[in-house]
Amino acid sequence: MFKVWFATAALVLAVVQVMTGARIFGKLERVVPIPRPQVNRVHRWSGRLAILCTLPVAFHCIFILGFQTTNARVLAHSIAGSFVYGVLAVKLFFVHDRAHPRWVLPVVGGTMAAVLTTLWATSALWYFTNVRFGF
């Protein structure tokens, strides 16, 4: 049950990441009317917290459950879970490397958000709609 809520928190923080990332790149200035230094700070901390929320979930999924292929949902979840920290590593590499085209970082960030959304949809959303919604 804790995994569902941690995954949901990570997804909410990923949405914050997408919104603030778009604001940093000059988009959504009216939607996110926060000055640039604060947007940078919110972007960094929401990313750190999102990854922090994924760690207990990943630990449980990797070491207790492992890679599974029982049905299409579980297979999609296992594949997305296999990619999530690899995509994170690529994103962190491009954050610190300035010798890349300007479009690369938003693409990698969007890929990270898509992978987290896939993980959430194939786990927490499924749990909320098929098992139960509650604490």
Can you annotate each of these PLM segments?
Residues 1-135:
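Membrane-embedded alpha-helical bundles that constitute the cytochrome b-like, heme-associated redox core
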